[in-house]
Amino acid sequence: MENKKYKTVLIGTGRIGFLLGFDKKREQPASHTMALLKNKKIELCAGCDTDLERLKIWQKYVKSHGSEGLVFESGSELYKNIEKIDIAVVAVNESAHLEECIRAIEARPRLVILEKPVALNSFEAQKIADCAEKNKVPVMVNHERRFDKNYALAMQWMEKIGEIQRVEAELDSGLRIYAKEFEKDGTYSLLHDGTH
C-alpha cells in the first residue's frame, strides 16, 4: 500500500475554509481545513488569507494538529514559495473566485478544488474552464452536501417514490435571495446555496 501524502494548500481561511469546522450544529467536517486535516493522505502544508489575525489563528490550529502550517498573505506569495503542489483548495469569497482560481491553475497543481459557486457569472466560469484546459489542470467544484446524511436520506426517498414530477423548496440561509446589485460579490442565497 502506498503511503504517499498529497501536498495541499488552502487559499482562504474564512467561513468555509476554516471557521465552519467549529460549528457544533453542522455535520463535521464542515470546513476545508477540518476535512483536509482528517484525511490521512493529505499533507496540509500552507494556507493564505488577507485577514492576518485569522491566518494566525489558523496557523496555530493546524500546527497543533500536525501540519507544517506555513502562512502567506496572498496566493501569489504562496505559489512563489511552495513547489510541487498536488492539490490547491480555493475557498475565498465568490468575488475573488476568478482571480484566485486562475492563479491556482497557473501554479499547475495536480488538482484545484474550487468552492462553489464556480464564479459570479457564466463568463467568469468560462474563463476558469479555458484556463484549466489550457494548463491541463482539473478543477473540481466542491459540493460536499451530496455526501451529507440528510441528502443521502432524501435520495433514498426519491428512489422509493420514483420519477420526480415537481419540487418545491424553501431555503433560509440568512443571505439575501437575489438582487442585481448583489452580483458584484455573490452574497446572495440563490447563487451561494441554490446549487445544492
Regions found by a protein language model. Give the residues of each.
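A contiguous active-site-proximal alpha/beta segment in oxidoreductase catalytic domains
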Residues: Y79, A119-F182
